[in-house]
A protein has these predicted regions:
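Small-residue-biased structural context
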Residues: 2-168
Length: 168
């Protein structure tokens, strides 16, 4: 097969050969050093916080007279939050354990959060479009998240900062 050459006036020529290897997307690798791991975990914290704030604001806006047509997307976003929180907690545990900075209390706190996150199934009772129980659930998760992030996580992250320094 032949080669097709494409060009625009003033731009670089591009060649499309039939036997040209397809370029694979770059492989994503998890960071191996603590500073990069910490940065990724902090970005996840930020996204989780935004998700919680958004869902709480939407639940307040929906109120007890929620329209059944509006709630499915909100319920889907609640499920996304549950999944994102679970994945974040597992990754954080793995990395903190790798640096010797995950204690049993921190792990137990994560277990409680996972249990609390799974206690509510948004939209399970479709006859009741009132998001008030979910609002209370979201506020409870938010409270845990803020306390945990500023408490157990902050302590464990400082320990990991110290543990990964050369000569310590």
């Amino acid at each position: 097969m032949g080669t097709i050459t494409l060009s625009r006036s003033g731009s670089k020529q591009t060649s499309l050969a039939a036997n040209a290897p397809a370029s694979a997307p770059p492989a994503r690798h998890w960071p191996r050093d603590w500073p990069s791991q910490k940065q990724l975990l902090e970005r996840q914290h930020g996204r989780l916080e935004v998700m919680l704030n958004t869902l709480i604001a939407e639940a307040r806006a929906l109120g007890p007279l929620a329209n059944a047509a509006v709630t499915p997307s909100w319920e889907l976003n609640c499920r996304r939050l549950q999944r994102a929180l679970g994945l974040h907690l597992r990754l954080e545990e793995r990395w903190l354990a790798q640096w010797g900075c995950l204690n049993s209390g921190h792990r137990a706190s994560h277990r409680l959060a996972r249990t609390a996150a799974c206690q509510v199934e948004p939209g399970k009772d479709s006859r009741r479009p009132d998001p008030t129980p979910e609002l209370e659930w979201l506020q409870g998760l938010q409270e845990w998240f803020f306390v945990h992030r500023d408490g157990a996580d902050a302590i464990a992250y400082r320990r990991a900062d110290h543990a990964c320094r050369p000569g310590t």
